[in-house]
Protein backbone atom coordinates (compact mmCIF):
# COMPACT_ATOMS: atom_id res chain seq x y z
CA UNK A 1 0.00 0.00 0.00
CA UNK A 2 1.34 3.41 -0.93
CA UNK A 3 1.54 6.24 1.53
CA UNK A 4 1.23 6.20 5.28
CA UNK A 5 -1.86 5.56 7.34
CA UNK A 6 -2.15 7.27 10.71
CA UNK A 7 -5.16 6.47 12.88
CA UNK A 8 -4.93 8.90 15.78
CA UNK A 9 -7.77 11.39 15.82
CA UNK A 10 -7.07 12.67 12.33
CA UNK A 11 -6.41 10.33 9.43
CA UNK A 12 -4.26 11.08 6.41
CA UNK A 13 -4.52 8.66 3.50
CA UNK A 14 -2.39 9.24 0.41
CA UNK A 15 -1.96 12.87 1.46
CA UNK A 16 -5.24 13.59 -0.39
CA UNK A 17 -8.01 12.39 1.90
CA UNK A 18 -8.54 14.15 5.19
CA UNK A 19 -10.93 12.23 7.43
CA UNK A 20 -11.90 13.55 10.83
CA UNK A 21 -12.80 10.97 13.45
CA UNK A 22 -14.72 12.53 16.30
CA UNK A 23 -14.28 11.06 19.76
CA UNK A 24 -18.06 10.65 19.81
CA UNK A 25 -17.78 8.32 16.79
CA UNK A 26 -15.46 6.03 18.73
CA UNK A 27 -17.86 6.20 21.68
CA UNK A 28 -20.75 5.11 19.45
CA UNK A 29 -18.69 2.23 18.02
CA UNK A 30 -17.71 1.19 21.53
CA UNK A 31 -21.31 1.23 22.80
CA UNK A 32 -22.59 -0.71 19.81
CA UNK A 33 -19.98 -3.44 20.21
CA UNK A 34 -19.94 -3.68 24.00
CA UNK A 35 -23.67 -3.44 24.64
CA UNK A 36 -25.20 -4.97 21.49
CA UNK A 37 -22.44 -7.11 20.00
CA UNK A 38 -22.88 -5.34 16.65
CA UNK A 39 -20.18 -4.00 14.34
CA UNK A 40 -22.21 -1.86 11.92
CA UNK A 41 -20.57 1.43 12.92
CA UNK A 42 -17.10 -0.14 12.95
CA UNK A 43 -17.67 -1.49 9.44
CA UNK A 44 -19.05 1.85 8.26
CA UNK A 45 -15.92 3.68 9.41
CA UNK A 46 -13.63 1.08 7.82
CA UNK A 47 -15.66 1.38 4.60
CA UNK A 48 -14.98 5.15 4.57
CA UNK A 49 -11.25 4.49 4.79
CA UNK A 50 -11.34 1.95 1.98
CA UNK A 51 -13.32 4.27 -0.28
CA UNK A 52 -10.79 7.05 0.25
CA UNK A 53 -7.88 4.96 -1.05
CA UNK A 54 -6.73 5.38 -4.64
CA UNK A 55 -6.88 2.67 -7.28
CA UNK A 56 -3.08 2.41 -7.03
CA UNK A 57 -3.40 1.42 -3.38
CA UNK A 58 -5.27 -1.70 -4.47
CA UNK A 59 -2.57 -2.94 -6.89
CA UNK A 60 -1.03 -5.41 -4.41
CA UNK A 61 -3.73 -5.15 -1.79
CA UNK A 62 -4.28 -8.15 0.50
CA UNK A 63 -6.45 -9.34 3.37
CA UNK A 64 -3.92 -8.15 5.94
CA UNK A 65 -4.55 -4.52 4.97
CA UNK A 66 -8.28 -4.87 5.63
CA UNK A 67 -7.46 -6.40 9.00
CA UNK A 68 -5.01 -3.59 9.74
CA UNK A 69 -7.66 -0.93 9.14
CA UNK A 70 -10.03 -2.65 11.58
CA UNK A 71 -7.20 -3.23 14.05
CA UNK A 72 -6.21 0.44 14.04
CA UNK A 73 -9.79 1.55 14.67
CA UNK A 74 -10.24 -1.05 17.42
CA UNK A 75 -7.06 0.09 19.20
CA UNK A 76 -9.05 3.12 20.34
CA UNK A 77 -11.71 0.97 22.03
CA UNK A 78 -10.07 0.92 25.44
CA UNK A 79 -12.46 -1.44 27.25
CA UNK A 80 -11.30 -4.34 25.06
CA UNK A 81 -8.16 -6.40 24.91
CA UNK A 82 -7.40 -6.50 21.21
CA UNK A 83 -5.85 -9.68 19.83
CA UNK A 84 -4.64 -10.11 16.26
CA UNK A 85 -3.90 -13.60 14.98
CA UNK A 86 -3.86 -14.93 18.55
CA UNK A 87 -2.59 -18.50 18.45
CA UNK A 88 -5.19 -20.88 19.84
CA UNK A 89 -4.25 -24.54 19.37
CA UNK A 90 -2.42 -23.71 16.12
CA UNK A 91 -5.37 -21.76 14.77
CA UNK A 92 -5.32 -17.99 14.32
CA UNK A 93 -8.53 -15.94 14.55
CA UNK A 94 -7.94 -12.69 12.66
CA UNK A 95 -9.24 -10.28 15.31
CA UNK A 96 -10.61 -10.81 18.80
CA UNK A 97 -12.05 -8.02 20.92
CA UNK A 98 -12.22 -9.37 24.47
CA UNK A 99 -13.83 -7.24 27.19
CA UNK A 100 -11.25 -6.35 29.86
CA UNK A 101 -13.94 -6.38 32.55
CA UNK A 102 -16.02 -9.48 32.04
CA UNK A 103 -18.33 -8.77 34.98
CA UNK A 104 -20.21 -5.96 33.18
CA UNK A 105 -21.78 -8.20 30.54
CA UNK A 106 -19.97 -6.55 27.64
CA UNK A 107 -19.99 -8.42 24.34
CA UNK A 108 -16.87 -9.85 22.74
CA UNK A 109 -16.24 -9.88 18.99
CA UNK A 110 -14.36 -12.30 16.75
CA UNK A 111 -13.84 -11.40 13.09
CA UNK A 112 -12.46 -13.48 10.23
CA UNK A 113 -11.42 -11.54 7.12
CA UNK A 114 -11.06 -12.51 3.48
CA UNK A 115 -10.13 -10.38 0.48
CA UNK A 116 -10.94 -10.63 -3.21
CA UNK A 117 -9.79 -8.41 -6.03
CA UNK A 118 -12.54 -6.77 -8.09
CA UNK A 119 -12.08 -9.29 -10.92
CA UNK A 120 -12.63 -12.16 -8.42
CA UNK A 121 -16.03 -10.86 -7.24
CA UNK A 122 -17.82 -13.98 -8.50
CA UNK A 123 -16.05 -15.94 -5.72
CA UNK A 124 -17.74 -13.90 -2.96
CA UNK A 125 -20.06 -16.66 -1.70
CA UNK A 126 -17.23 -19.18 -1.77
CA UNK A 127 -15.02 -16.88 0.34
CA UNK A 128 -17.88 -16.14 2.74
CA UNK A 129 -18.39 -19.87 3.25
CA UNK A 130 -14.65 -20.42 3.77
CA UNK A 131 -14.55 -17.65 6.38
CA UNK A 132 -17.70 -18.97 8.10
CA UNK A 133 -16.23 -22.47 8.39
CA UNK A 134 -13.02 -21.07 9.84
CA UNK A 135 -14.76 -18.94 12.42
CA UNK A 136 -17.03 -21.81 13.45
CA UNK A 137 -13.91 -23.93 14.05
CA UNK A 138 -12.38 -21.19 16.16
CA UNK A 139 -15.57 -20.78 18.19
CA UNK A 140 -15.28 -24.43 19.30
CA UNK A 141 -11.83 -23.95 20.84
CA UNK A 142 -11.78 -23.83 24.66
CA UNK A 143 -9.95 -20.48 24.89
CA UNK A 144 -12.53 -18.94 22.58
CA UNK A 145 -15.50 -20.61 24.29
CA UNK A 146 -14.35 -18.97 27.54
CA UNK A 147 -14.99 -15.49 26.12
CA UNK A 148 -18.45 -14.56 27.41
CA UNK A 149 -21.09 -13.11 25.09
CA UNK A 150 -18.98 -13.61 21.97
CA UNK A 151 -20.38 -12.50 18.63
CA UNK A 152 -18.69 -13.80 15.49
CA UNK A 153 -18.53 -12.12 12.09
CA UNK A 154 -16.98 -12.72 8.72
CA UNK A 155 -15.98 -9.80 6.55
CA UNK A 156 -15.12 -10.38 2.92
CA UNK A 157 -13.79 -7.37 1.07
CA UNK A 158 -14.18 -7.26 -2.68
CA UNK A 159 -11.74 -4.51 -3.58
CA UNK A 160 -13.19 -1.58 -1.58
CA UNK A 161 -16.60 -3.04 -0.65
CA UNK A 162 -17.16 -4.90 2.62
CA UNK A 163 -19.60 -7.81 2.91
CA UNK A 164 -20.41 -8.71 6.51
CA UNK A 165 -22.10 -11.83 7.84
CA UNK A 166 -22.93 -12.58 11.47
CA UNK A 167 -22.14 -16.18 12.31
CA UNK A 168 -23.97 -16.77 15.60
What are the functions of these language-model segments?
Residues 1-131, 137-139, 149, 167-168:
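Extended alpha-helical interface modules used as scaffolds for assembling large macromolecular complexes
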Residues 128, 143-168:
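Domain-level recognition of nuclease-like catalytic cores that cleave nucleotide substrates
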